[in-house]
Amino acid sequence: LCANTGAALHLVKPLGFDLDKRSVRRAGLDYRWMAAVQVHDDLAACRAALVRAGAGRWWAIETGGTRRYDEARYAPGDVLLFGSEGRGLPTAVVDEIRLAFGADAVLEIPMREGNRSLNLSNAVTLVTYEAWRQNGFGVTR
């Protein structure tokens, strides 16, 4: 996904998977060399790296968000923040995003009543492509 869209991927430990060559290939990340991937020890280190890189607005994608992901207006450099597949984002992180960027910076993906959530990779793909679409796709081929 990152190689195809040009998005940078920032992972925060602890990871729920291995980044060794065999695991990465099995997960479909065998062209990781084409993507910008950084692993951070904690969210504070990730945040500092993103600030140094000139990150824009932060968006928290979370069940129970204030508005739908397709209602947001994304800009180049924005940060899409997803939690772990099982637990989502910590409440303190969601509160921090609300405080810094407003309640409407917490987004949700609509789904049918009674369903909990999409898996993480599908959610990331959906929101990333919407942000990319809004910014003209930037396709170079």
Annotate each language-model stretch with its function.
Residues 1-141:
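Post-transcriptional modification and biogenesis factors for structured RNAs
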